[in-house]
Amino acid sequence: AFVIPAGQADMTRVAFVADVLIAQGIELGRTRGEVKIGDLAFPAGSLVVRLDQPYGRLAKILLEKQDFPDPNLRTYDDSGWTMGLLTHTEVKPVADKAILAVPTDPVDRFTAKGRVDGKGEGAGWIAAAANGSANLVSLRFELRSMDVHAASKAFAAGDTRLPAGSLLIEVRGAA
């Protein structure tokens, strides 16, 4: 199987990979709790892609890292098949068959969920972390009528570290 761990920095990339797999007919399961298999640990909500399914071979092709056995005989391929590398999404192969016994719920559509940290009391700014997501461009477009700034260097807001390029949106009239 392959596991796509929950809690990655940009879950919209995970959503993209999951949606591509689902569109191909590949079955995904979301873990109900934390998973520990040998030295590997995955948080609750991780996605399990079993290879013992009708489209298991396709899942393997899309998720497995391509290895060329002889660097002098590299074949030309105008397609990229390693979804994790293409999308900067962590995808872990798991050879231990114990992964097949992990309780999961079927996933028909994956939706990335954001979060808001802080209580909002006295908050005058909302920050959107610059984690490389193409969705920041869409966010910036949707907020075109608002004052949106980009952080010129990394900074911390409470316990949260935000990289340079993070969007800062002023919230006027915040309580």
Give residue ranges: language-model regions.
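Intrinsic-disorder/low-complexity accessory segments
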Residues: 1-175
